[in-house]
């Protein structure tokens, strides 16, 4: 029986071990083993709950470039969604008790309870991305110290499909690199 066990091969991760008994896998400090692949401790960090404010869809990314915004606008229009620009002062941009309209026992962080000012009307029937981009520039010129976001609506499903920031005030310090958002 012992001789049979000695000839057995056990696979541990990507390595095979002769003798049938797998050695204990040594864990390095700050790492863990997942399917035989060692991960770094930054992959297991805790999300920072303080001063880690987010906006809409792409908040985890660095601020979008003009080219990236243009591609998003093209995607929105290609799907026949209605774009709409909204803006808010820095102190009114985040969901909170001070700038939240209460409709019953709804928490202040519930996103539908926060309203931004609309820039003109939604761009119903818009098929030209340059029109959306020129309105963004006009809104930014009129309100340089405000947050400006682009939201879009699907008329068929009658819902907001997406929303993302297209302008942050120059004084904004809310964006943090993902590595800085963790403890």
Curated annotation (Swiss-Prot):
GO terms for molecular function: monooxygenase activity; ribulose-bisphosphate carboxylase activity. Residues 1-43 form a transit peptide. SUPFAM superfamilies: RuBisCO, small subunit. It comes from the Eukaryota. It is found in: Plastid, Chloroplast. The keyword Oxidoreductase applies. GO terms for biological process: photorespiration; reductive pentose-phosphate cycle. One of its GO terms (cellular component) is chloroplast. Keywords: Calvin cycle, Carbon dioxide fixation, Chloroplast, Lyase, Monooxygenase, Oxidoreductase, Photorespiration, Photosynthesis, Plastid, Transit peptide. InterPro entries: RuBisCO_ssu, RuBisCO_ssu_dom, RuBisCO_ssu_sf. The keyword Hydrolase does not apply. Pfam families: RuBisCO_small. The basic functional RuBisCO is composed of a large chain homodimer in a 'head-to-tail' conformation. In form I RuBisCO this homodimer is arranged in a barrel-like tetramer with the small subunits forming a tetrameric 'cap' on each end of the 'barrel'. Belongs to the RuBisCO small chain family. RuBisCO catalyzes two reactions: the carboxylation of D-ribulose 1,5-bisphosphate, the primary event in carbon dioxide fixation, as well as the oxidative fragmentation of the pentose substrate. Both reactions occur simultaneously and in competition at the same active site. Although the small subunit is not catalytic it is essential for maximal activity. Heterohexadecamer of 8 large and 8 small subunits. This is Ribulose bisphosphate carboxylase small subunit, chloroplastic 7. It comes from Acetabularia peniculus. The gene is RBCS7.
